[in-house]
Amino acid sequence: MSSVLRLFKIGAPVPNVRVHQLDASLLDAELVDLLKNQLFKGFTNFHPEFRDKYESELVLALKLILFKLTVWDHAITYGGKLQNLKFIDSRHSSKLQIQPSVIQKLGYGILVVGGGYLWSKIEGYLLARSEDDVATDGTSVRGASAARGALKVANFASLLYSAATLGNFVAFLYTGRYATVIMRLLRIRLVPSQRTSSRQVSYEFQNRQLVWNAFTEFLIFILPLLQLPKLKRRIERKLQSLNVTRVGNVEEASEGELAHLPQKTCAICFRDEEEQEGGGGASHYSTDVTNPYQADCGHVYCYVCLVTKLAQGDGDGWNCYRCAKQVQKMKPWVDVDEAAVVGAAEMHEKVDVIEHAEDNEQEEEEFDDDDEDSNFQLMKD
């Protein structure tokens, strides 16, 4: 093991807390993501196409600002400051804790901030050129083949960098000196800002997180059982009944809020269109009843509107907009007065009976006349 360490020039372990260094890098990444999301939200209603076109440049500018305010000015990142860490020049003794030189800071900014941006642009360019093979003169075809070759080299370089990152991470876990490959190349590392500070473990955040997780799980379990729309409808009906009781007027209680609409107008369509137009009123012509169906309260609505309201009621019914009564059932509306039909039928039956009686009386009178004529003739003979 010692021969392998000497081969890679890995020194002896130092008493640095590895977890703090890894947490510092994670905090820095989360800070960049948080600021990036806030920056992009600013372009939601103001030239969103600019954000989509220059997304990588905006992220680069954000990282440059953070680099200037942290590493360049104070030789530490925000995540490192939260973990009580700072950068030092490892070429000198760790007891001196000399800050990195200007060259080291500049190299850190170029490699960390600008390196990712340049590499993404190079890969995007090579990928776009490798697919450009539609020209007929052969120029673009040759350029595409060269781009594909360069893309393979870039992929191989990415593979080598990933392997180097893995090897450096294993070495970091052993020595605790250099958390990244770039820090190893520049010979800068993280050390505690105050050596006399003791590690204080606070469980306040963990306890708060556990409480919120338990509360969230409880809500996720209980909310589907509450049936909030159904509960809301019951409360609304209860409030309506209280208002009716407070008014104490039977005539007003028997009328709904849209009782003034004509019979041919669907009150549900009228209400929906009025809400869409912001309360400015709806046209009676555009809300006429289509495929009329009759509620059990007697008022007529569109079939689709009535079915939708009853389905939303989930078995609790729905309050009619015209009479404020609870609607539970519906049936097809027939534009025929059954009472009038029954009355007409009874009238026809009475007329038939009267006509039949008159015919019988007329026949009896004719029969009597015939009998009198026959008797008179017999007496004459």
UniProtKB/Swiss-Prot annotation:
Where Zn(2+) 2 is bound, by residue? 297, 299, 320, 323
**Subcellular location as annotated:** Peroxisome membrane
Q: Catalysed reaction per UniProt?
A: [E2 ubiquitin-conjugating enzyme]-S-ubiquitinyl-L-cysteine + [acceptor protein]-L-cysteine = [E2 ubiquitin-conjugating enzyme]-L-cysteine + [acceptor protein]-S-ubiquitinyl-L-cysteine
* Recorded topology in the membrane: Multi-pass membrane protein
Biological-process GO terms, alphabetical: protein import into peroxisome matrix, receptor recycling; protein ubiquitination
Keyword set includes Ribonucleoprotein: no
Please name the InterPro entries in this protein's record. PEX2/10, Pex_N, Znf_RING, Znf_RING/FYVE/PHD, Znf_RING_CS
Q: Tell me the PANTHER family matching this sequence.
A: PEROXISOME BIOGENESIS FACTOR 2 (PTHR48178:SF1)
Q: What is the protein's name according to its record?
A: Peroxisomal biogenesis factor 2
